[in-house]
Amino acid sequence: MNKQQNQQNPNNQQQRKSLFAPYLPQVSLPPLLKNGDLVSGVLRINKRNRSDAYVTTESLDADIYICGSKDRNRALEGDVVAVELLDPEKVWQTKKEKEEKKRKKEESAGIDKKKVDKKKDDVEVEGQGLLLFEDDDIVTDEHRPKYCGHVVAVMERMPGQLFSGTLALLRPSSTATKEREAAEKARREAEERAAGIEPKVDESKDDKKDEKNERPKIVWFKPTDKRVPLIAIPTEQAPPDFVENHQSYAQQLFVACIKRWPITSLHPFGTLVTQIGEIGGIDVETEALLKDNNVSAEEFNENVTKCLPPIPWTIPEKEFELRRDLRSTRIFTIDPSTAKDLDDAVSCTRLPDGNYEIGVHIADVSHFVKPNTALDRDARKRATTVYLVQKSVPMLPPLLCEELCSLCPGVEKLACSIIWKMTPEGKTMETWYGRTIIKPCAKLSYENAQEVIDGNPLNAEVKIFNDHNTKEIEADIKLLHELAQRLRDQRFKRGALSLGSIRLNFELDEQDDPIECTVYKPKDANRLIEEFMLLANMSVAQKISSAFPEQALLRRHAPPIERRLNDFVEHANRLGYDDFDATSAGALQESLNSIKDDDAREVLNLLAIKPMQRAKYFCTGTLDIAKYHHYALNFPLYTHFTSPIRRYADVLVHRMLDAALSGEKRFYLDKDAVQKTASHCNVKKEAAKNAQEQSSHLFLCVLLRNLTLQSGPVIREAIVIGVKDHAFDVLVPAFGIEKRVHLDQLPLEKFVFNDETGDLVLRWKPGVSSLEPIPDYDGFGEDDDVLLDVDEEALLADDHDDYHYLMDVTSRPSDEENRLFDANSDIGDDDDIDDDIIGDESVEINQETTKTTVPSVSIHESPKVDYNSISETTFNQSPAKISPPVIKINELPQLQIESDPDTPNSQIIRELCHLQVVITADCKKSPPVIKVLAVNPYA
């Protein structure tokens, strides 16, 4: 290590201390991994406490715990890392010793213990999403990790990874330290003057003045994602007046990237990419979340557009010779009303023998996207269309996804079709696969189809083409619905599981501002399409895995995380469901179905998602066949075939199916290339899902802010879904949000937690609104950054007051480490996604339904408040600076509460009880923060 350090710092007169171990050379990793000396996996960092990280690996039956920044060794969220295993007992003992040392350091520094606790259970981080993340990522004496390790190399990193954030002149902890020192000095001088002692004049004052006037060499970039460290940025890359006017940039969002991270530096060095705009605006926050999730929203370049066919385009004559002609077959699409990329259609033909031909017809994207072209490479790089509330970011150019490939009615289209001969009971007798030419006769929305299922006529506004009529389509919809119901019943009898995730629909005005919101509920029309898409995907999986047992791209879903599943079952037992069975997907579904109480079923359905793992793409030749299984669907083989316009994995599967039907012995990509594409699609699919959820969160925050400004505090009913000793978790059904209510933010005189019953007894301060500021809690400030830095630094070295080594711009990492941050790293230009793991297809089919007109959410008419004199900026300030309007309980709809007869002004909080909460949104933070407070029933 010392030799490498000397080589990296040849001009150093004084050897600087190495804070991290150098990475092992990439060439040395394969044999070490093969021999089991190292294991590889994907790193994730705890959102509440970035000192805790975990590596998920196929090699072990549990995650590897990475304790502290030093053992994480400069690895970032999502990196593929090589890990050397360590003795868990030794790691745990070291962790306890460091925590004790850190605690003493905090006490000596005068850091408020309450804020230390707040750092561990970060309200701001909790408020940046719609749902809570997992508590059991936090290791404790009761939940010690099974495996521990340290990162010895970063094997893969997302190329060109960007981060949104803010700029600061000084490192946040340095600023806070100087403020504390100044306050301490002022206090000491005041005491001296009171004692008649003249304070000593600082003789180095002039020197400090000169030091102050010296222009700093770096400024600090603070990413909005707390899992990413502060990044040192050269001052010349900041705005020209930043040093003099840095306070005026406090609310400006920038984008930066990491360029290098020397082993002698606590923080990485980076480059400022661009300035986005002011925090809080929908456009600015949307651009930020796209950057944070590495979503490419740039226009398609000239090399890509050159691959597109000339317009007008017609189907070549030779295709009529090679394909089955289905133009006269009654085929129609059922999609969200706003959908433009129509990539799936269905058909139903009655046969003379009483059986049916049921067809699923998918846009033949692979006809236009040829392997190893610029268009193909760009589609692979993007990997998926990203659906936001107000827009989508397409995987393919609009000419393809909205015109040539989209199955528009009345137009001849190229398709890949699967046609089953099916009995009236839904039993498949034969399956036909092949390329076809179709001419859809109608474009239906889910609402149109649902009206027919409900017994109403098809909406007269639906245009019918190709000499077909409304009655025929109505009959087809009803028959498809009946068959879908039978298929669904059979699927669940075989042991399938469906846990619907909470999704929001927004109605937007002409400026794309949210005006209404509701929780999305799937209907029979959605399930109709879902069942046939699932059947198509399963059928194709069987075909391609049979043809290419070593090269097929499939999709698997691993069983739930055992410890989390056990905790969930214990939770169900506490609620009185002693016979709750979660030994299989089918058993879990039956247990949930047996719950009669609506609240309990809704809560347990939500909590059952938390032990589940994400479904993932994989290549058959790289994994043991025992791991192919899809847990939730209970399918032995499954893939994605039905959405090639918006998923690159489906494009590859189409090519595999075509190769299988052509009788090819081997697919054109080997198993390593297929697996590399599968892994890339997994990463991009996860990023797309995160972006979609963050977009919904952003629009909900804006809606909550607007409702508050218009009508006063937003108050809704909530269900308690979990109780802790200092907090309780609630579900707010009206907005589909899950939040933690912290007791130290409520106007309580005292509270008592009963370990035996798991109940909380709150004693409220009478006449005090929950929105009035709490003296001991003044919101978020720079001290939160101090605590994060104290935590990180304590794990690295004893003395981090002097950051002179960060100024060393001569220190260079190895070429291999440099390439980790290289935006031009080849993710596969020359080489050759998960929604909630449950209801896999139903979630994806309806991604565009987030921007629709929906029934209004009832807005509680609280006492009107004159906000004309309060600017938006003032309203979003810390509660310590402005007192919101007082809420009186008698002005709200009455809600029965349970109280303790021995405690005045009391309220008992237990699981499944209902209470009123006030929901606030702070749009002056990025991402914006939602906070939920229990309403004081005695105010």
What residue spans do the PLM features occupy?
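Terminal, basic amphipathic appendages of nucleotide-handling enzymes
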Residues: M1-D344, V386-Y387, C441-Q450, G758-D759, ...
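Intrinsically disordered, low-complexity domain-flanking/linker segments in eukaryotic proteins
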Residues: V91-H143, S174-R215, E461-N466, S770-S899
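Electropositive polyanion-binding surfaces
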Residues: S204, K226, T235-P240, A250, ...
